[in-house]
Each structure stands twice: as C-alpha cells, then as structure tokens.
Amino acid sequence: MKKSWFYLWFTLTTLSAMSVCTAATILYPVVVGGRWGYVRKSGETVINPQFDRAEMFAEGLAPVRMGRWGYVDATGKVAINPQFDKAEDFSEGLAAVKLGGGGPAPFNPFGIGGGHYGYINPEGKYVVNPQFDDAGTFAGGFAAVKMGGHWGFIDKTGKIVINPQFDDAAAFSENLAAVKLAGHFGYTDASGKMAINPQFEKAQPFSEGLAGVRTGGKWGFVDKSGKVTINPQFDDVGSFVKGLAPVRQSGHWGYIDPTGKFVINAQFDEAAAFSEGLAPVRQSGHWGYVDPSGKLVINPQFDEAMPFTGDLARVKSGGRIGYINASGKFVWNPAK
C-alpha cells in the first residue's frame, strides 16, 4: 500500500524514538545551509549543523551521515565512527547497518542493491556479522532478515528462529508479524506458526488489537484470531492509535473507531494517525492538524506535515523544513 512520506517516517523513527525519550530530552534534526544539526524543543541549537544528513535519536543515538553513516550521542560527540553505507535506528539495543551497495537513506527495510546487513550494539561492535541481503528493526526480540531471496526472522544473537521462506515480512507487533507467502499475506507468531493463514492481498501490523487487511481490493480490519471485525469497505487505512484509525472512503479520509463507525467524517485529501493528541490532515492542497473531535486546531497551511514527536511536529513550508508546537507556532522557522 502506497503511503505518504510522513507515514514511513513516523512508523520507522518516531515510535522508536518516543519509546525511549521524554519530551524534555528529544532532539530534533534541522538543516541550515545544507548542513544538519539538532535543536531542543525550545529551538535552541544543541548540536551545530555539520552533517550531510541527520535522523531522529533512538535509544540515545542518532544516525548521521558524514560521507558515510555513523552515530552521534545527544552532546554531538561521535559515538560510532562513520563507516557504513546505511545505518538504521537503534531498537532493543541493536541497529541494522549495511556495508557495500551505497545509498543515501539511513534506513531502507525493503531496499535493493549490493552489500550486506548486520547488527551492531551501541559501542559499534558487531553482534551479528553482515550477511543479510536486507534487514529490519528488532521488535519483541526478533528482526526480519532477507537471505537468498526470502525473508525469515532472527533473534538478538543472530540465530535464525524462523527459516527464510517468505516473500515479504514486517516487524513483529503485538506478538504477530505480517508475512507474505505464495502471493498472500497472513500473520506468523514467534514460533513460526501461522496464526492467521495467508489470505490477504495486503496486511498491516497489529495496533491496539486490530490490523488493517485488504481483500477484494478493499481494506477492513481483523483481530488476532483472524476474525473480521470491520468489513472490507475502505480504499486505504492506517493504524489505530488511542481508538482512532485514518481510513479513506470515496476519495476522502476520515477517522473510525474500533467498531468501524466514523468519528470524524471522511473529508480530507489525506490523513495520518494521531500522535500527542493531534493528527496531520491535508485539505485543499495544504496540511494542518485536527484533534480527536475532528476540530482543525492548526489550520491547513503547510506543504508537508509529520505527526508530533513530543512537543513538536516537523513541517515543510516553501521548500524548507521547520518545527511547530501544538498551537501551530513555529519554534524553528523554515526561513532559517
């Protein structure tokens, strides 16, 4: 399912960062004159712009590119020297890194190209040597890895716990992982047993006990037993967060509750999941934010907008990146 850039960013970085940081300690990447650094939620510069690229912090370290990828700590000190062609966020004490193949992106779980992935610890030492064609983040003690054209799962020692056999695989979420087998998606448990048999055209990770699945060209939701709880009727869906999930119907996005009832009517051109009580929505070509009642608390005015991480949300205006607070006021102005 095609998603906007903010969906990918939110899923792959914000959640991991928020699991280990408080709003008081989160640092935000900014770009000045083509160089990247970090600011606090107040807009105060903490790490001067000096990197080719910088990503969000997770578990106290952030991937940064200085020709090649390495990691810095919250003081800006290089904790792991730049040496990788790709570097993923830390999750559960390990980070997937790639040697060979190049590429500017810090994390590409389904990327293509040469090189091999392995996993390092916060000291930069390999815990799992580079050997995989592709690799995802650890979740629930397991990570999806690709070998010989198929996906399986390893534990934190690098031991294969579910043999590579799948055409595609996502990270574990709520003890189940979406996998693709023989052209259809289902869900496996940590033992490798199919908890929900492959039967769907597409499948999303579980969130709050429900997962979006597509069948017959329409999206609905199933519970962990595989029972359909919300009939397939939507053109697209996102994940449930605090009882609300974005869905698209008849060309517009709104939000439903776990019974499938619309809480916020379908009226937006695009919409993302809630975070910190607000959700990005696009209307008339611009992005703003709504609260759980559907009220526009920050009027549509941005070219792009991401979900809130702590107290701030990253937005783009006039081609420049900035950060706003929950009132919509710029803390880091895109003009900088």
Language-model features: where?
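Bacterial N-terminal signal peptides
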Residues: 9-17
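Bacterial N-terminal signal peptides that target proteins for export
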Residues: 1-9
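Residue-level detector of conserved, function-critical positions
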Residues: 21-336
